[in-house]
């Protein structure tokens, strides 16, 4: 059965949130968080040129994940800055007056339903999903809710979407094949994002500053070259995980473990 694409509305986003409310929330959250990225700590952005001339819809950003909220907040700053012609910098927060509103991010439902601040973040563009492998700190095994997949595709039909293919803030966790299946089906332009330093600068939620003087980094890479017809979801996933530098070859501890094993085997 053919999927019906959601029609654009000049007053609301893909899920009915009024644009004026979304603009207000992005502006307030942006001003509150600004000093975290250009004051107490200095966010270093690179690769903004890879965001120029992208289409307004069906662009999927895939990123590693280090905190619940600081990662996404920093990305909002970067996208809004580029939307107003500021490349690789967030030094002039005037860009918050003209934010990119057709912008969404995939987030765990349980995270976005905890506390008033999480609910405010949700208004800014969260597309919530129930994790199939983890819930309330316990391992689970449940089926994917296809309505949630449809919501992500609806968001892509209407704008840009960020997803975190590992589904966790743990470094070098395995990628989830659902992201690759979505890519193969929806055929978006896929832009990898590599972030670093957020885990050191902020607490796990990304709300409290742990250390000042840190320079978190955010690198926007070139679009992935994907053969949507012939590459399998597993091949696409491997390409995504390598691009966001979450495979074993980027894990220094993994290399160290291998060196120890080789040393022990040779003795």
What do the predicted segments below correspond to?
Residues 2-46, 74, 115-124:
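A transmembrane-helix-recognition feature enriched in membrane-embedded lipid enzymes
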Residues 21-22, 35-42, 106, 137-143, ...:
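Short, flexible loop segments at the rims of nucleotide/cofactor-binding pockets, characterized by
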Residues 33-66, 76:
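Helix-to-loop junction immediately C-terminal to a conserved catalytic motif
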Residues 44-47, 113, 145-149, 175-179:
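Amphipathic coiled-coil/heptad-repeat helices and related helical stalk/stem segments
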Residues 55-140:
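Catalytic core of membrane glycerolipid acyltransferases/transacylases, capturing the structured
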Residues 127-172:
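Internal catalytic-core helix/loop-beta-alpha segment
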Residues 254-267:
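Short, highly charged C-terminal tails/helix-capping segments
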């Amino acid at each position: 059965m053919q999927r019906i694409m959601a029609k654009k509305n000049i007053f609301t986003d893909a899920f009915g949130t009024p644009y004026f409310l979304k603009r207000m929330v992005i502006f307030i959250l942006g001003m509150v968080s600004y000093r975290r990225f250009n004051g107490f700590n200095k966010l270093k952005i690179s690769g903004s040129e890879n965001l120029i001339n992208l289409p307004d819809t069906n662009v999927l950003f895939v990123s590693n994940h280090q905190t619940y909220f600081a990662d996404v907040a920093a990305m909002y700053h970067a996208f809004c800055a580029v939307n107003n012609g500021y490349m690789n910098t967030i030094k002039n927060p005037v860009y918050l007056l003209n934010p990119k509103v057709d912008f969404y991010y995939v987030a765990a439902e349980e995270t976005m339903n905890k506390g008033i601040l999480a609910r405010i973040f949700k208004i800014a563009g969260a597309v919530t999903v129930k994790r199939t492998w983890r819930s309330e700190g316990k391992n689970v095994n449940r089926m994917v809710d296809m309505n949630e997949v449809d919501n992500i595709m609806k968001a892509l039909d209407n704008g840009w979407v960020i997803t975190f293919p590992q589904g966790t803030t743990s470094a070098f966790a395995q990628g989830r094949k659902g992201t690759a299946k979505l890519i193969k089906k929806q055929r978006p332009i896929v832009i990898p994002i590599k972030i670093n330093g957020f885990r050191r600068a902020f607490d796990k939620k990304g709300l409290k500053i742990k250390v000042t003087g840190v320079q978190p980094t955010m690198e926007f890479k070139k679009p992935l070259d994907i053969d949507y017809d012939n590459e399998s979801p597993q091949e696409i996933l491997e390409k995504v995980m390598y691009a966001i530098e979450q495979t074993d070859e980027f894990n220094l501890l993994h290399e160290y473990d291998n060196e120890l094993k080789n040393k022990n085997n040779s003795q």
